[in-house]
Amino acid sequence: MNQQIKYRNRYNSPKGITIVALVVTIVIMLILVGVTVTIAINGGLIGTAKDSKEETRYTQVLAEKEMWESEKRSTDRFGAKAETLEEFVERLKKEKILTEEEGKQILELGFVTIEKKDILLDGKRNVADASLWDYQLDTKTNFVTITRYLGTTDNLTELTIPNFLLIDGKEYRVTKIEGHDAWQAIANFNGNVIISKGITEIGKASFNGANKITGVEIPDSVTLISDYAFQYCRSLTKIRIPGSVKKIGNWWDNVNGQVFNGCSNLKEVIFEEGIEEISGRAFDSCSKVEEWNLPKSLKRIGQWAFSSIGVEEFNIPENVESIYASFLSSSNLVKVNVDSNNKYFTSVDGILFDKNITRLIKYPEKRGSSSYEVPNTVNTIDANAFISCKNLQTIVIADSVEKIGDSAFYGSKLKTINLGGGITNINNKPFYGALNLTNINVITENDKYESENGVLFNKGKTILIKCPPAIINGEVYEIPNTVVEIGPQSFYRSQIKNVIIPSSVKKIGSESFFQCYNLEELNLSEGLERIEWRALQQCNKIKTIVVPSSVTYIDKECFRSMGRINQNNDKKSWGLNS
């Protein structure tokens, strides 16, 4: 016959339970006399008791929960009848370990909330009728995700998102706001949104485009603000992000975060301690924020997280350990500072490097110098490292530098780049968007590359890698007769009018002359075999191209946006109709 084991009758429990009970009893006694005790459950740290009545009560709840679960496992094994959850809750309420409200939450939701003290203890219920909301009910957990507000916002100055929905007479806990553009229904709501405590996630694109809301109150129960959540909320002027939020966006290693992207009137962001990760483009175009006080807890900053902002100085706190290339751009930036206790990064004359000064990460856009020599400890220049530099005209790349990232000089006023001897693998990509370049020079000791009249070639000049866009303005450029291949994007956005291609050239690479808006004449010689993808796209001033009979391949996208092509059978002349 099954014997019911009373929860407090420790002596009738199996041996393992007696030991658990004894240990937990000692722990509780120590807590009650003021000793700090850390309790680990299932190998994980659950809570630390501090010198406060509320923390002691919280620890008691955890200890009682562990004992109850341990006894339940054992009694199930031996076929005995254990204390039910209802009996457990009722007993803890009588002993004033649990409040009435907390007991109700445990009975409704189980123990899933017990490790979230801010939800379990002294939480406030904001119950709303389900008729005002679109929602999704997870029947396994009984948790609700709110996806849309169905009511009217007329005459409202404040809208509260509830933490409980009344569905068919029963209350269900709301844990998440979700749904792409879920709040477009309040796009014209000119007021403050209050998210009730207990909601743990602000889902993807939840408030995207709700451009008239003036404020959002985020509770400290929220642990994740997902991608695009507040994108283009253009009336937001201030936001507080609680320390419970560990991640602002899901992706730090690409540009898909965009949590507050386009919040163009945002002036103040309060980051509380606890935040660890800021995703890609999280605060892109938040140009009115005058100071970014990042928390000490921050560990990772994503790609373009602070793109197109407006500050003169930017500070990296002490615990940041990962910074994605291209994390920062500001047209007013003069200086990047790094906390002296940071183990991973440093600043030299306002320029951001890794701690050992082997990686140049960020050169400020508005730094005053017209020339700069990269330190000889650096081996890598990050992508977009010199983006939009206004005053820099000449840069000397040290022999130690082996790699230059894509678009490293994009949008800058640079005229001259002097490459050292360490560069062993380079293409056109680092120079992409550097439209003011007139000269790319290579030190003669470089074994892989050389230059002639400011044009970059491989060693031996068989491949033309990059002709600087501003090297010749309105003149003719004749490619050396050693060249066999014109590399991809080699003349991209060049100002040149006429290019003469010798018979040695066999291949014109992808986008070689892409967007050469001034190019009027391109002379192709017999011997040319291939014209690749978009090679002449948007060269709108070219009227006629004479294609030699040696050509065996022309990509179908080659002449796009140049007018209709008349393809003669003999391929000798392709006339372009305006």
PLM features: residue spans?
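Extracellular/periplasmic head regions of type IV pilus-like filament subunits
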Residues: 70-123
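N-terminal leader/signal peptides at the extreme start of proteins
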Residues: 1-15
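Intrinsically disordered, low-complexity repeat and linker tracts
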Residues: 49-62, 123-133, 147
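N-terminal single-pass transmembrane signal-anchor helix
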Residues: 15-39
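Basic helix-extension-helix modules of the SAP/HeH family
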Residues: 36, 40, 44-48
